[in-house]
Amino acid sequence: MSEHQSLPAPEASTEVRVAIVGVGNCASSLVQGVEYYYNADDTSTVPGLMHVRFGPYHVRDVKFVAAFDVDAKKVGFDLSDAIFASENNTIKIADVAPTNVIVQRGPTLDGIGKYYADTIELSDAEPVDVVQALKEAKVDVLVSYLPVGSEEADKFYAQCAIDAGVAFVNALPVFIASDPVWAKKFTDARVPIVGDDIKSQVGATITHRVLAKLFEDRGVQLDRTMQLNVGGNMDFLNMLERERLESKKISKTQAVTSNLKREFKTKDVHIGPSDHVGWLDDRKWAYVRLEGRAFGDVPLNLEYKLEVWDSPNSAGVIIDAVRAAKIAKDRGIGGPVIPASAYLMKSPPEQLPDDIARAQLEEFIIG
């Protein structure tokens, strides 16, 4: 387990001040979701939330105080408008009043692939000093929602979080929390990180992972498996550029296979995005097949299709990741937050069985 470095805890505020990098569909669902659940009863089980109140923080305690993007239709606009602008096409679940948070121009770096570049217009505004912007907004947690393949850009924002003393939630498959060098940077700086690569509430990865483990636990030899995903959002369009996919395929594959005892040949496990289908909008369809052998080596195959709205499915997990990062910051913890990362992320520094990871997260919440 990665070491946590603890300091005397600073005085905790009653809110979680969040900055967002990448005002796309996932950001849209998160911002709308905070509004949607603003008056949720924290004494009841509420559909769509694992925790109405996560430690001391209710969903409504999440406040958006800064945002960064490169899209000309988002930069310079209020966050409440930007989340519905340009190519954003997720389902609308709530009206969002003006936030008085103006989306700022971040550096582009490698954040825009060729399909993005053909689709959106880049803002001609000068990139801001991100570290200074984080400090001025008194940000507690920075959430990175950059496009898949944004290796340089994601690490740039991770360093900005360290320099500004801001907790970091790494929602994309760039290996930062799970990279010992970066984990040490966060630990040494006494800055918490939750990562890498967000799991959905009930998505292709978590269902595939659970069913593969079920095969193993029930004595069925899993011989081969595949997972194909199609969707109509900018994430899937971006992933048509296969050069940007390496870390995504690794992350999704190890999220499934790391839960199993046996090793698989590369050809026997195929997990990854398949294609972009524009009319699906922000919906994702996953096709999953598991082939195994049961009693007497008799074939046993399982095939299913999962249909989800991709971004709300992610937001239901990010809302907990953000609050976990804030609790770690309140407690003076630096480095990877293992319980939150193991339960909420595909590629945490330490892979744990889901039941153990969940139990550890509940213990972490209690403190």
UniProtKB/Swiss-Prot annotation:
<dbReference type="GO" id="GO:0005829">
    <property type="term" value="C:cytosol"/>
</dbReference>
<feature type="binding site">
    <location>
        <position position="248"/>
    </location>
    <ligand>
        <name>NAD(+)</name>
    </ligand>
</feature>
<dbReference type="InterPro" id="IPR002587">
    <property type="entry name" value="Myo-inos-1-P_Synthase"/>
</dbReference>
<dbReference type="GO" id="GO:0008270">
    <property type="term" value="F:zinc ion binding"/>
</dbReference>
<feature type="binding site">
    <location>
        <position position="137"/>
    </location>
    <ligand>
        <name>NAD(+)</name>
    </ligand>
</feature>
<feature type="binding site">
    <location>
        <position position="200"/>
    </location>
    <ligand>
        <name>NAD(+)</name>
    </ligand>
</feature>
<feature type="modified residue" description="N-acetylserine">
    <location>
        <position position="2"/>
    </location>
</feature>
<keyword id="KW-0398">Inositol biosynthesis</keyword>
<dbReference type="InterPro" id="IPR052199">
    <property type="entry name" value="MIPS"/>
</dbReference>
<comment type="similarity">
    <text>Belongs to the myo-inositol 1-phosphate synthase family.</text>
</comment>
<dbReference type="GO" id="GO:0006021">
    <property type="term" value="P:inositol biosynthetic process"/>
</dbReference>
<dbReference type="GO" id="GO:0008654">
    <property type="term" value="P:phospholipid biosynthetic process"/>
</dbReference>
<dbReference type="GO" id="GO:0004512">
    <property type="term" value="F:inositol-3-phosphate synthase activity"/>
</dbReference>
<keyword id="KW-0007">Acetylation</keyword>
<feature type="binding site">
    <location>
        <position position="157"/>
    </location>
    <ligand>
        <name>NAD(+)</name>
    </ligand>
</feature>
<keyword id="KW-0832">Ubl conjugation</keyword>
<dbReference type="Pfam" id="PF01658">
    <property type="entry name" value="Inos-1-P_synth"/>
</dbReference>
<protein>
    <recommendedName>
        <fullName>Inositol-3-phosphate synthase</fullName>
        <ecNumber>5.5.1.4</ecNumber>
    </recommendedName>
</protein>
<feature type="cross-link" description="Isoglutamyl lysine isopeptide (Lys-Gln) (interchain with Q-Cter in protein Pup)">
    <location>
        <position position="73"/>
    </location>
</feature>
<feature type="binding site">
    <location>
        <position position="78"/>
    </location>
    <ligand>
        <name>NAD(+)</name>
    </ligand>
</feature>
<keyword id="KW-0413">Isomerase</keyword>
<keyword id="KW-0520">NAD</keyword>
<dbReference type="InterPro" id="IPR036291">
    <property type="entry name" value="NAD(P)-bd_dom_sf"/>
</dbReference>
<dbReference type="InterPro" id="IPR017815">
    <property type="entry name" value="Myo-inos-1-P_Synthase_actino"/>
</dbReference>
<keyword id="KW-1017">Isopeptide bond</keyword>
<dbReference type="InterPro" id="IPR013021">
    <property type="entry name" value="Myo-inos-1-P_Synthase_GAPDH"/>
</dbReference>
<comment type="function">
    <text>Key enzyme in myo-inositol biosynthesis pathway that catalyzes the conversion of glucose 6-phosphate to 1D-myo-inositol 3-phosphate in a NAD-dependent manner.</text>
</comment>
<feature type="binding site">
    <location>
        <position position="235"/>
    </location>
    <ligand>
        <name>NAD(+)</name>
    </ligand>
</feature>
